[in-house]
C-alpha cells in the first residue's frame, strides 16, 4: 500500500458457491500440540496428534481454518475425555457447521510395579479420543492400546530367584 488507499480484501470463504456441492470434511490434520491431560495424580504433560474437521454446506466455499488453531489454544485446563463434547460444540458454533470430527492421539504414562520384585517403572499407553457430530448427535469414543506381556511357567518359576523383574 503505497498510496494511502484503504484496500478491502474479499472474504472468499464466506462467499456463495454456485457449484452447490457439500463437502463432508474440511479442516486440519497432522497438528502436533502439547496438551495437559487429567490424571489420577493431577495432570500430565504430553503431545497430541490432532485432526479437526467440519462439514461444509453446499452453498459455502470454505471455512475459517485459523479457528481450529484458536480452539486448540483455548484449552487451558487439564484435558479429560468428557471435554470432547464441549470442544465439539465450540468448534461447530465457531465455524457455523452442523457436522464435525475431532481426533486426539497421544501417549499417556503410568507407573507400574513388577510382579515379583515390585520395582516401579513407567509404561506408556497410546490413547485415541474421537468425537463426531452427525445428524445433531455427538458421539465420543476412547481407545486405549495397552501393551500385554505373557509369562511362561518356566520364567515365572525362575523369577522367584531374581531372574526377571
Where are each of the predicted segments found?
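N-terminal intrinsically disordered, cationic/polar leader segments
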Residues: 2-165
Amino acid at each position: 500500500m503505497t498510496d494511502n488507499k484503504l484496500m478491502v480484501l474479499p472474504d472468499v470463504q464466506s462467499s456463495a458457491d454456485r457449484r452447490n456441492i457439500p463437502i463432508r470434511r474440511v479442516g486440519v490434520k497432522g497438528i502436533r500440540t502439547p496438551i495437559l491431560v487429567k490424571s489420577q495424580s493431577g495432570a500430565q504433560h504430553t503431545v497430541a496428534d490432532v485432526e479437526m474437521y467440519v462439514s461444509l454446506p453446499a452453498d459455502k466455499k470454505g471455512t475459517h481454518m485459523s479457528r481450529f488453531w484458536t480452539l486448540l489454544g483455548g484449552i487451558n485446563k487439564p484435558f479429560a475425555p468428557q471435554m470432547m463434547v464441549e470442544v465439539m460444540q465450540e468448534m461447530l458454533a465457531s465455524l457455523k457447521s452442523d457436522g464435525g470430527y475431532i481426533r486426539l492421539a497421544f501417549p499417556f504414562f503410568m507407573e507400574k510395579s513388577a510382579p515379583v520384585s515390585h520395582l516401579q517403572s513407567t509404561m506408556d499407553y497410546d490413547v485415541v479420543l474421537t468425537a463426531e457430530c452427525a445428524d445433531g448427535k455427538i458421539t465420543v469414543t476412547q481407545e486405549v492400546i495397552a501393551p500385554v506381556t505373557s509369562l511362561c511357567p518356566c520364567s515365572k518359576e525362575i523369577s522367584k530367584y531374581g531372574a526377571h523383574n
